Amino acid sequence: DGMVVNNKTSERVHNNRGGVVEFLLANHPLDCPICDQAGECHLQDLGYEHGSAKTRYEEERRTFDPIDIGNKIKLHMNRCILCYRCVFVANQLTENRVHGVLHRGEHAEISTFIEQAVDNDFSGNMIDVCPVGALTDRTFRFKSRVWFLKPMEAERSCNKCCGKAVVWMFGNEIYRVTARKDKYGEVEDIDGKTAWLCNDCRFEHKSATDWNIAGPRVINRHSVISQGKYATSMEKPVKRIG
């Protein structure tokens, strides 16, 4: 009805967002130089756009030791912003969720119940939906920065999932496999269904011969990944092969 919402140009909105980001960063460590999520971290982007050069927070930050919550997933609770996305996704994908939010208030943390291991066939999707580096892929840990890799659309025949993924390559070697995401960072819908990946496709098939590679993934030209002389951007659609 003629309503105009200025969500980017309004100084008031920008200042309010800065306040929210400051709260999110209150307990967040400066791990960007060593975090595998650097370069594709939503909080890193928000901090760069709205954050202050220094914090006003003087109290001691919460600290946790990194733990393995499965044989493929590392949890860095120091980086967690308690968005609960991993919990919601686990509820969708399994009836036997073994992790969640423990305690309340400032003592709340993500962990497994009675230190059980997360081992369902789709647990790797929790890594994809984590907006920060709280959940990371142990098979990719510290191997490369994302801006050194080339994301390629690929697929394979799989009886557990859709088999459609993004393989991150350096030369002819696949360093990691992730679900396909849209421009908002959400896992894409393919054929009317969310394109979750099974753990077999994600962790066990990292040879180029395991996949039918269609071509470069379309990315935003402002992404740090595009700085690695990556030609395909959102403004220049990719020409499919086959």
Model-derived features with residue positions:
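N-terminal export/assembly segments and adjacent metallocofactor-ligating motifs
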Residues: G2-H28, I34-G242
